[in-house]
Amino acid sequence: SDSTVFLLQPKPIRAKTRHAYTDWEANDYYRVSTPHFDIYTDSKPADGVKIARQVERLYSVWQQLFVEFWCDTAVLAERFNGSNKPLYARKRHQIILFSSREEYQGFFKRRTGATVNSVGFYAAEQKHSFLFVSDPPKASTWLHEVTHQLFFELGAQVPDVAAGQNIWAIEGVAMYMESFREHGHFVTVGGFESYRLQFARYRKTV
């Protein structure tokens, strides 16, 4: 992985305007921006920084694992001959990080009238990932939902993807990325550390 991503030190900035989507008032939340993400949170600044660093590392690894999904390989071939054409259309990915599960549930209750029991959610229509701070952190959920986000926003956008079939592939690859683990200046993916991946292995082998 690009070693610079391990040195990333994003700075939280107290927002000066009302947040259009959550209705958080000015000065009541923070924005943490990285090269590829904007994280908005009403939690402690350190919480925003923590997830910002993690999703940037995920982004770096995701790009390397799934290069043919997001990259124009014909342009990549031209790059080796000196071309400077962009490999893909860069986008900024939006994440809302609530300070607690109660805040998270309250947000969806106000918007939909329904009680939400999930621990994280990527909304393809709004192009936002919705997450919340917990102790211990639900890092696997962050990795899972942002993986959905990257596939949808950087690949061919298919309306209602997996609504009728192939949900196993969509959820399977997100679960695979839950196994993302950092080891100093390198990472691993696909190891036994992923709790939910063990159920898939069990069903395959037993």
Task: Please state what every model-predicted region is.
Residues 126-205:
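Zinc-dependent metallopeptidase catalytic helix centered on the HExxH motif
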